[in-house]
Amino acid sequence: MKEYKDTLNLNETTFSMKGNLSVNEPKTYAKWQEQQAFKRMQNRKDNHGDFTLHDGPPYANGHLHLGHALNKILKDIVIKREYFKGKKIYYTPGWDCHGLPIEQQILEQLEKEKTSLENPTLFREKCRDHAKKFLEIQKNEFLQLGVLGDFEDPYKTMDFKFEASIYRALVGVAKKGLLKERHKPIYWSYACESALAEAEVEYKMKKSPSIFVAFDLKKEGLEKLKVKKASLVIWTTTPWTLYANVAIALKKDAVYALTQKGYLVAKALHEKLAALGVVDNAITHEFNSNDLEYLVATNPLNQRDSLVVLGDHVSLEDGTGAVHTAPGHGEEDYYLGLKYHLEVLMSVDEKGCYDEGIIHNQLLDKSYLGEHIFKAQKRIIEQLGDSLLLEREIEHSYPHCWRTHKPVIYRATTQWFILMDEPFIQNDGSQKTLREVALDAIEKVEFVPSSGKNRLKTMIENRPDWCLSRQRKWGVPLAFFIDKRTNKPCFESEVLEHVANLFEEKGCDVWWEYNIKDLLPPSYQDNAKHYEKVMHILDVWFDSGSTFKAVLEDYHGEKGQSPSDVVLEGSDQHRGWFQSSLLIGCVLNNQAPFKKVITHGFIVDEKGEKMSKSKGNVVSLDNLLKKHGSDVVRLWVAFNDYQNDLRVSQTFFIQTEQHYKKFRNTLKFLLANFSDMDLKNLERPHDFSPLDHFILEALETISAGVNSAFEEHDLVKGLNILMAFVTNELSGIYLDACKDSLYCDSKNNEKRQAIQMVLLAVASQLCYFLAPILTHTIEEVLEHSQVLRAFLQAKDVFDLKGISVLEKLHLKEFKKPENFEAVLALRSAFNEELDRLKKEGVVKNSLECAIEVKEKALCENLVEELLMVSFVGVAKEKLSETPAFTLFKAPFYKCPRCWRFKSELENTPCKRCEEVLKER
């Protein structure tokens, strides 16, 4: 029998089924770099506006992990999506270069080398070199992800110009009257020997002693209450702070009960405390707390007086209703102390050990000198003697240093703060506090997800003043001079701008290198002897929080507009970068420095647990890229609900690889089947069939859905719409029905050419929607298809833009086939019956069948195409009958070329195939 395979249109494409991504992607990216792809993104001339995404800087220390990849890939998808919509893109990646982790790395390195480095300039030089090294490492690792941005000129917070900009932002805060030096309790990391801001504190479970202690009322108090014995009972989980107790706080207007044994507690808590065995059951007297105010008790640890005061923070839900108050070790205690003029006792050094103040103020025995507070607690508890009513251990949420993961303490020190509740002048001449301005600004920002708005609002509503100063070396100094004559900072503009100019020219190392005279402008140098330097450095959150000024404002729009269109970071940045940026923006410009905030979750393992080396559940980013390629990693990011935590395991990546293969193989099929098109046919109108109109209308519908989802940054929804279309309407219906025409019709056949135009339209939209995510792959698609490039008038992926399917195909409207849903229902019923006949061995495939449809209104051609039968009508040999149709054995012979049962003679081509063969 004659072989007809070579007469079919079995077109091939050089676009491979196997992507070999880990090998090919680096070559593609190198080409983009050579062609300056990002410059093209910056210079788009479609006049659809500009788009600025401001990069929250990663820390220049260590290698990238999967969390970094998640963040940078999401940003890349967002900016490419805006670019393909026709906008000019501004995106400058940056790095946070100062701070404690780098200091710790250098200190560990020096310890290994058994050397010390007292010279701060040389120490800072080592820190700078360390940051440079990892900045380059991370930059190269980012590029492997296929992300684009201004990586040729990234921002670095340690650059001289940048340090000067950070300092000028600080000066702006000072000029508004919001920067003040205060002696008050702040979070202190004894492990880092430095103050911490709220954003640098994380809460973890910690075991602590829980003790109930009796403070005996002094004689005058007993006489006032007309009782012989009364002891206020306090509860604390920080026995080490008892040395600094100066007061006991009660709830205002609350009832306090005195027991038979003389213990005084809140009546609302008496029953609970009696059940614990802290106090006895019998109540002999009741007092209003207001009548107890200003009584004096005795601290059993050191016999010092403890004043009874009233505080709004006192709870009647737990504890005793009598709160141990040490203004040197608690913020609420401190503010209560201001009201009652309480003494601030604080005798703990920067390492967390008791200092000589315990001796000078007779707070503790000298044997405690130099002992760490947590080690001393056991002795302190023992020293309480009979005043200790109950001791037990509890596990509770406790603040820890986010860098060292060690517990932190409250410690009163002199620090610099940005004041949240100090009114300052607004643009309209009114006065508002920073808290008020920030809360107003939040209302004008869009949040994705929307829950982020209330989260940030709550944090701003409840946050304390921002502690800016750090007792370290690697950072931007709080470069102010204190006038020794007045003990006030010099905020003269001439002095501050002179220092800023020095930083810009020589870097802020000069603050350590130069003497005071050389740091002052000439007109102030004669008074140098009256000044001393502030030697604290800035909280690194101020560095990163002021990046919008250094990157967007100082470059006057060359690197984007301020406020930026979008910022996109992990959800932890509500208490970090989003908050610091918001506060600085509100001080300097009375507005948020961003229009939209998008947040993502964290990377966790398949059980939902945080990844850590100790658990052995870390998934290596480098290994993922080598095994799957960056486009699969990018698709994994996009196909997950990134607004929640992302679970990761090899199983998830294998699933993603299947999604990727579906998209890739679909594109390969499309490319192959329009590869033989004559380019002259691209611009002329075509005669589209009802089936063509069906798929084109479906394409238009899903395009609107995908666009809408992507506009809302719902990548999962958009991709699921796209995947459902590819799987169901496209592959499951249209492509199956069109294969006969594509493979067997003449290349000049109008029906086939119309189908090819449809395939081009589908490929175009797939490329447009997938390009922000699978950029390497879509570049490869275009590289391997001259026809698609001509259709889109695009030489590569960066020329892509959205198309109007109607306009591109010269159509005014889509004409959906009549009764199409009925034909699809018929197809479903037919396939069920066909499966039964196949299992029974009656037929091998649908082409062996003829069908008589009982609903005569259905289009016969459409039925034949969609059901892929050889004949619609009655034939001799009945195979089966259902209420909707009757199946017959096809009445003609099998065509040896197209395999349809259309031939009038055995082993002879059907009429259609004969005509095609004549043309060849």
From Swiss-Prot:
Keyword hit for rRNA processing: no
Residues involved in Zn(2+) binding: 895, 898, 910, 913
UniProt cross-references to Pfam families, sorted A to Z: Anticodon_1 (PF08264), tRNA-synt_1 (PF00133)
EC numbers, comma separated: 6.1.1.5
Binding note for cofactor: Binds 1 zinc ion per subunit.
Motif residue range(s): 'HIGH' region: 58-68
Protein localization: Cytoplasm
Catalysed transformations (reactions): tRNA(Ile) + L-isoleucine + ATP = L-isoleucyl-tRNA(Ile) + AMP + diphosphate
GO cellular component terms attached to this protein's record: cytosol
InterPro entries: aa-tRNA-synth_I_CS, aa-tRNA-synth_Ia, Anticodon_Ile_BEm, Ile-tRNA-ligase, Ile-tRNA-ligase_type1, Ile-tRNA_ligase, M/V/L/I-tRNA-synth_anticd-bd, Rossmann-like_a/b/a_fold
Binding partners and assembly: Monomer.
Description of its domains: IleRS has two distinct active sites: one for aminoacylation and one for editing. The misactivated valine is translocated from the active site to the editing site, which sterically excludes the correctly activated isoleucine. The single editing site contains two valyl binding pockets, one specific for each substrate (Val-AMP or Val-tRNA(Ile)).
PANTHER family hit by this protein: ISOLEUCINE--TRNA LIGASE, MITOCHONDRIAL, SOLEUCYL-TRNA SYNTHETASE
The protein, known as: Isoleucine--tRNA ligase
Record organism: Helicobacter pylori (strain J99 / ATCC 700824)
